[in-house]
A protein has these predicted regions:
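C-terminal outer-membrane/trafficking sorting elements
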Residues: 15-18, 607-617, 621-696
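Low-complexity, Pro/Thr/Ser/Gly/Ala-rich linker/spacer regions in secreted
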Residues: 20-23, 162-174, 592-610
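Loop and turn regions of beta-sandwich accessory domains that flank beta-strands and are enriched
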Residues: 20-168
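Bacterial Sec-dependent N-terminal signal peptides
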Residues: 1-21, 602-603, 696
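Middle-to-C-terminal accessory/interaction subdomains
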Residues: 174-177, 185-189, 193-197, 228-230, ...
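Residue-level detector of buried hydrophobic side-chain packing
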Residues: 73-75, 141, 159, 181, ...
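Short beta-strand/loop motifs in extracellular/secreted proteins, especially
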Residues: 69-71, 81-83, 196, 237-239, ...
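Phosphate-handling architecture centered on phosphoinositide signaling
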Residues: 157, 161-420, 528, 541, ...
Length: 696
């Protein structure tokens, strides 16, 4: 039962424009096992709470109650924003006696001992209120008593507004790049980009940047919007932006050492208190030879207000320097042209189509949804959508079939095994609770460039590396891909793929090889922990400003697992301890179950050349055969089939291929005579391989 008490304003303390306190003294009952609202009117303030002029600085409560742990105390703004001041704190102790809440107090209410008197940091940061909302109107103090037998009294409560609002930070210089955004009178919203001006200052490593410096990296127009899904409720917002010219057209520019483009992300690591979980995952993928978003730590100012530490990074996009697949044009609807390139994703977005195979272990009829990302759902042509859907359907059907391990008709005909291996390692090391089922991207190039489905780029790892308190996301044991049996009722399930892949000897052997390679290099704990330490050193000064702006250390922010680190150093120490234990579990569960044969042919191919390994199968062939290539360098390739007279009877000229494994399917040879043939594969650097084939 919820009760409502409305009280007339008892007192107002006014000190010109510096501070204004509103308080009431209701002496009202706090009923047993009930949620009760107590309200207070606020008026006469400016119409926006912000960090520049006026905002909420503190809250105060005076409660008599025999058992504080029974209470959850929430402050609610006129616009409906809710902040928990206290939640089940104090154990069996009693009373909040003239208890004040300031974000700047080093001792959080979680750490206090009842009776609570004096000043504490609230359970959640008050600075979240200072988000341009109107402070005038009805404020609510909601008190939930969760048990029976213990009642109490709300004696008084109040709110202090001032020109020193919670979260206000004095900011003049940084060792990180400084981004300054000015929107004029416009408000940044989600879904539609507004026009703004952006300046970027970066004097180089080791040289301090001052907010008064002349912008030397970028100064010009942008379009900017709030982005994200669950993160939109956080005090620190994420932004997507486009660099534009004076006419509003997109313009490609190189920013902070990244290749020229116009689509960028300002990632806000609000609920990742290490500030670096995404950066770690993306760097891991790049060290495995995959493209992943390049990242630069920076500090952001919007309309004169300090916003904290951000990560400036590339957006996933078809581009020669990002997802390097052929850009699909509207006219590309037939033949080779329709075969690529595509980016699709598995996420919460409206589905372009659903998986033909339901997820394993789900209990509520959930379906895996695929969404067209590039071309997007608006721009993609019907024949293009039909093609990529049919291709993914064929991949799933082959993987789900009894012959799924067959190299010619199984899933390997459609998918790059090595890309799935690399993706598996990133997700399993990080125990990403969203892994495989959300923010999961796949891409496919044209058949002249390999044409297989590849998983990636990796994206969205803020809930990884022990940063989720649900569905076993915080455990160092267990497989992340086995999410469905743990949380079978969750709407967003993991595709069946991974349950099948881990039973395939080809996948297991490649996993063993790559994991062993990485554990002996980048994922050696000395090396990996050095990257964590280097990132921490880089943001060392900035993190103090960040956590003054967002007073959340030592508190719960969804979905942080307990215990909540009270310092930045403790957060990173906890993360490293977790990673060490996680690697030990993976060592015990990957290393015993694979065989690594780096070169499977007897060819004398120099590892410095492009071609590392080439094979063709089946041999003899009848209707078709597969050319499998493992390449070491970016190059284009000629694949030529000769008869015994030296005549070229079939030929494929590939586009530029990056280091990876590729399969090319030669399926137009059913009509050629039986006999002996020579297959020659050659690269730009002169390396080549010739294989004898027999047509039976």
């Amino acid at each position: 039962m919820k009760k409502l008490y409305f009280f007339v304003l008892i007192s107002i303390t006014l000190t010109h424009i510096n501070a204004q306190t509103f308080s009431v003294s209701p002496s009202a009952l706090i009923p047993d096992n009930t949620t009760t609202n107590y309200t207070m009117a606020v008026s006469g303030l400016p119409t926006q709470m912000n960090l520049a002029n006026v905002g909420i600085e503190a809250a105060q409560i005076n409660i008599t109650h025999t058992k504080d742990v029974d209470l959850t105390i929430t402050l609610i703004s006129p616009g409906g924003k809710q902040i928990k001041l206290a939640q089940n704190n104090g154990g069996s102790g009693a009373d909040f006696t003239n208890t004040f809440f300031y974000d700047t107090i080093p001792v959080n209410i979680n750490e206090g001992i009842a009776p609570f008197n004096g000043s504490y940091a609230p359970y959640e940061a008050l600075s979240s209120f200072n988000n341009l909302a109107n402070p005038n109107g009805i404020w609510t103090l909601r008190i939930r008593d969760q048990t029976v037998t213990n009642t109490g009294t709300l004696n008084s409560w109040g709110i202090k507004f001032s020109n020193k609002p919670a979260g206000k930070v004095s900011f003049s210089s940084s060792n990180l790049p400084i981004l300054i955004v000015n929107t004029g009178s416009l408000t940044i919203v989600g879904g539609t980009k507004i026009t703004a001006m952006m300046s970027i200052i970066d004097q180089g490593f080791g040289i301090p940047n001052y907010i008064t410096d002349i912008p030397n990296i970028y100064y010009g127009n942008i379009g900017i919007e709030i982005r994200g899904q669950s993160s939109t409720s956080f005090a620190q917002k994420q932004y997507g932006l486009e660099t534009r010219d004076a006419l509003g057209n997109n313009v490609n520019v190189s920013i902070l050492g990244m290749p020229p483009e116009n689509d960028w992300i300002l990632y806000a690591p609000y609920n990742d208190k290490s500030l670096m979980r995404n950066v770690l995952a993306y760097n891991l993928a790049r060290n495995m030879g995959r493209w992943a978003s390049r990242c630069v730590f920076c500090e952001l100012v919007i309309n004169g207000i300090y916003q904290g530490v951000y990560v400036f990074q590339e957006k996933i996009k078809v581009d020669a320097n990002r997802v390097n697949v052929t850009k699909l044009l509207p006219a590309d609807t037939l033949g080779v042209n329709v075969t690529g390139g595509y980016i699709i994703n598995i996420d919460k977005d409206p589905a372009s189509w659903y998986s033909v195979v339901p997820p394993n272990n789900s209990t509520a009829g959930q379906k895996i949804r695929f969404t067209c990302n590039s071309p997007d759902t608006v721009d993609i042509m019907k024949k293009q959508r039909a093609y990529i859907k049919s291709y993914v359907d064929s991949f799933e059907t082959a993987l789900n079939g009894v012959n799924f391990m067959d190299p010619l008709i199984g899933y390997r005909k459609y998918a790059s095994v090595t890309s799935f291996v690399d993706y598996f390692i990133v997700n399993e090391l990080s125990k990403n609770v969203d892994g495989y089922r959300l923010s999961t991207y796949l891409h496919k190039d044209r058949i002249t460039s390999g044409g297989q489905l590849k998983i990636g780029p990796v994206w969205d790892y803020n809930l990884a590396f022990n940063n989720a308190n649900y569905c076993n996301g915080n455990l160092t044991t267990g497989w992340a891909y086995r999410f469905n049996p743990v949380c079978s009722g969750d709407t967003w399930q993991v595709p069946f793929w991974w349950d099948k892949l881990v039973t395939d000897s080809c996948f297991k052997n490649k996993l063993y090889c790559k994991y062993t390679q990485m554990r002996n290099s980048y994922l050696d704990t000395v090396n990996f922990f050095k990257e964590i330490d280097d990132n921490a050193a880089l943001v060392n000064a900035a993190k103090d400003r960040h956590y003054k702006r967002y007073s959340i250390l030592g508190t719960y922010v969804w979905p942080n697992p307990a215990p909540y680190a009270k310092t930045y150093a403790e957060e990173n120490r906890n993360m490293k301890n977790w990673i060490k234990a996680r690697l030990a579990w993976l060592d015990a569960n990957i290393l015993p179950y694979g065989v690594c044969n780096w070169i499977t042919t007897g060819d004398n191919i120099d590892k410095n050349f492009s071609l590392l390994n080439v094979s063709a199968y089946p041999n003899p062939f009848t209707k078709a055969f597969v050319v499998s290539m493992k390449i070491n360098k970016t190059s284009s390739y000629n694949i030529e089939l000769y008869n015994i007279n030296g005549q070229v009877i079939r030929q494929i000229k590939t586009d530029m291929l990056i280091p990876d494994e590729y399969n090319f399917y030669i399926d137009d040879v059913i009509s050629i005579p039986t006999g002996i043939y020579l297959l020659r594969i050659s690269a730009q650097d002169g390396s080549s391989k010739t294989i004898k084939l027999v047509k039976s």
